[in-house]
């Protein structure tokens, strides 16, 4: 039997839904909703949360002294406290010369062959700085590989980029010819 610290789980979920969904590979809709299975899949990448189930998310909500989350129709959202701007309409933006992406070593071969793909999300998520990219990559691998994306060159050749916030850029699929592996 696995004992779950629901208070710590709530803090993890809050961080994922309110503050840094990009670190968890989550794409919130205009109202902040995300598919529960997507959240669970991301949580399961961390050893501490491998056994968390949808039932545990319901228990977490019930045990809380404040109503922080809502579950409906297979989706979950934080009700308040978001520190990220809601991105309802994504406007294309010219990116900086380079952007970064941290990834697990096990994905490098596929990325070299197919480029960076959204992997079930609407966009590829890129970081404006090395530190953020590596932090994101460490969610899946203790020694992530840093990818350097020649974003301005890709933009000039028709790849679309969108500004998510000051640390995150979104893009359509990026062919491997624009990526350096470090």
Swiss-Prot record:
Lineage: Bacteria, Bacillati, Bacillota, Clostridia, Eubacteriales
GO molecular function: NAD+ poly-ADP-ribosyltransferase activity; tRNA 2'-phosphotransferase activity
Alphabetically ordered keywords of this record: NAD, Transferase
Keyword Transferase carried by entry: yes
Coiled-coil stretches noted in the UniProt entry, renumbered to this chain: none
Family under the similarity heading: Belongs to the KptA/TPT1 family.
Pfam families: PTS_2-RNA
Annotated InterPro entries: Ptrans_KptA/Tpt1, RNA_2'-PTrans_C, RNA_2'-PTrans_KptA, RNA_2'-PTrans_N
BP term (GO), one: tRNA splicing, via endonucleolytic cleavage and ligation
Its EC number(s): 2.7.1.-
Organism: Acetivibrio thermocellus (strain ATCC 27405 / DSM 1237 / JCM 9322 / NBRC 103400 / NCIMB 10682 / NRRL B-4536 / VPI 7372) (Clostridium thermocellum)
Membrane-spanning segments: none
Protein name per UniProt: Probable RNA 2'-phosphotransferase
PANTHER family: PUTATIVE PHOSPHOTRANSFERASE, TRNA 2'-PHOSPHOTRANSFERASE 1
Protein task: Removes the 2'-phosphate from RNA via an intermediate in which the phosphate is ADP-ribosylated by NAD followed by a presumed transesterification to release the RNA and generate ADP-ribose 1''-2''-cyclic phosphate (APPR>P). May function as an ADP-ribosylase.
């Amino acid at each position: 039997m696995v004992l779950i610290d629901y208070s710590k789980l709530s803090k993890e979920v809050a961080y994922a839904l309110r503050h840094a969904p990009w670190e968890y590979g989550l794409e919130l809709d205009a109202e902040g909703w995300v598919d529960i299975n997507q959240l669970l899949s991301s949580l399961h990448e961390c050893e501490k949360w491998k056994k968390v189930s949808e039932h545990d998310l319901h228990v977490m909500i019930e045990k809380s002294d404040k109503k922080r989350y809502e579950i409906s129709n297979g989706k979950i959202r934080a009700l308040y406290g978001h520190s990220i701007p809601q991105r309802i309409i994504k406007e294309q933006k010219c990116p900086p010369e380079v952007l970064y992406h941290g990834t697990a070593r096990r994905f490098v071969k596929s990325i070299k062959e197919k480029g960076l793909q959204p992997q079930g999300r609407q966009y590829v998520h890129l970081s404006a700085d090395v530190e953020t990219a590596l932090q994101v990559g460490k969610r899946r691998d203790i020694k992530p590989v840093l990818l350097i994306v020649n974003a301005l060159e890709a933009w000039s050749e028709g790849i679309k980029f969108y500004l998510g916030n000051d640390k995150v850029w979104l893009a359509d699929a990026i062919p491997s010819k624009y990526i350096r592996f470090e």
